[in-house]
Swiss-Prot record:
Subcellular location as annotated: Cytoplasm
Organism whose genome encodes this protein: Rickettsia akari (strain Hartford)
GO terms, molecular function: ATP binding; magnesium ion binding; methionine adenosyltransferase activity
Cofactor binding summary note: Binds 2 divalent ions per subunit.
This protein's name: S-adenosylmethionine synthase
Cofactor(s) this protein cannot do without: Mg(2+); K(+)
Length: 380
């Protein structure tokens, strides 16, 4: 592809699926605070008046799941019965079991370096030089729009905003480089009394224009703001939410492939999460070192086995080295065994709830250790 149009979407922290992700990761963080070796596979379901937390957890500590759920929902912004969902009075049900011993025997090991993969599967990591964060521009800016919406809502700058929202950014590419924004779609839940005309003007002037590069906005850019005309009913009242249902929002906005496994609610022995973070770390350092303009990494595993089954690199014709040469460099300088990934990226720290909204990649927070560019020099 040389000249094309590409679209990615993001959703707010008040979107039902993201609420579920955040609850699952908050449970995980609370366990890791007191039991860094805890095994967690936590799934959340949210719907009208109800939150159900289930999964498999093996830990030496106790966590108050009901309190975690209520606190997180209120923090997100569902703290008013008029919104149709209120963290202080919704029902909370938990159904938690221990991790299967058949799975545990594959990942339990006195030598942490030889921890086996918690399951079979493949993961992908991606980086490109379209943005300073080495993320694809469409998903990067879609996330920024949602962060801006949440900021204006929580700071009461636009007091009629409510928690549920979605964004979509369509970019025009020429010679494989983003040159203009073709369209912006932004839907936000709102107070019933706000007029559509005032809402559209405020969203464009207060959310979109301060967030997106002005050089990419022009007279041909299309703005589609709350296209149905009304978005009062939102959150779990309008749609059920489930952990792991926004895997493309969580990753690269469709610009790269995805192994299919979600991230949230999983401790780092689950390669769906830890190896995907490692794959991003590798791809970002490859691009950061100038070895390629775009890089996609695939790593695959077998349950109970520490060493990867395969490692694959694709640079889409943007590297002076062959894909095979880059793969050789990767295997020389990156240890992709789960135990080594956990140790190198410090993945037993309680850092996960902040990953559960606005993307797991391309973030500047120090806890996002997989975003470090500390292997650039040895790859050059």
């Amino acid at each position: 592809m040389k000249n094309f149009i590409f679209t990615s979407e993001s959703v707010s922290e008040g979107h039902p699926d993201k609420m579920a992700d955040q609850i699952s990761d908050t449970v995980l963080d609370e366990i890791l605070k007191h039991d860094p070796s805890g095994r967690v596979a936590c799934e959340t379901f949210v719907t009208t008046g109800l939150v159900l937390v289930g999964g498999e957890i093996t830990t030496s500590t106790y966590v108050d799941i009901e309190q975690i759920v209520r606190s997180k929902i209120q923090e997100i912004g569902y703290n008013n019965p008029n919104y149709g969902f209120d963290g202080s009075c919704c029902a909370v049900i938990s159904s938690i079991m221990k991790q299967s011993p058949d799975i545990a025997m594959g990942v339990d090991n006195a030598n942490d370096d030889e921890i086996g993969a918690g399951d079979q599967g493949m993961v992908f990591g991606y980086a490109c030089n379209e943005t300073d964060s080495l993320m694809p521009a469409p998903i990067y800016y879609a996330h920024l729009l949602m962060r801006r919406q949440a900021y204006l809502r929580k700071q009461n700058v636009l007091p009629w905003l409510r928690p549920d929202a979605k964004s979509q950014v369509t970019l025009r590419y020429e010679n494989n480089k983003p040159v203009a924004i073709d369209a912006v779609v932004l839907s936000t839940q709102h107070h019933p009394e706000i007029q559509q005309k005032d809402l559209i003007e405020a969203v464009i002037e207060e959310i979109i224009k301060p967030t997106l590069p002005s050089s990419w906005l022009n007279k041909d850019t299309k703005y589609l703001i709350n296209p149905t005309g009304r978005f009062v009913i939102g959150g779990p009242v309008a749609d059920c939410g489930l952990t792991g249902r926004k895997i493309i929002v969580d990753s690269y906005g469709g610009m790269a492939r995805h192994g299919g496994g979600c991230f949230s609610g999983k401790d780092p022995t689950k390669i769906d999460r830890s190896a995907a973070y490692m794959a991003r770390y590798i791809a970002k350092n490859v691009v950061g070192a100038g070895l390629a303009d775009r890089c996609e990494i695939q790593i695959s595993y077998a349950i109970g086995v520490a060493a990867p089954v395969s490692v694959y690199t694709e640079t889409f014709g943007t590297s002076k080295l062959s894909n095979e040469q880059i793969t050789k460099l990767i295997t020389q300088h990156f240890d992709m065994r789960p135990g080594k990934i956990i140790k190198h990226l410090a993945l037993r720290t309680p850092c996960y709830q902040k990953t559960a909204s606005y993307g797991h990649f391309g973030r500047e927070d120090a806890d996002f250790t997989w975003e470090k560019l500390d292997k650039v020099d040895i790859l050059k």
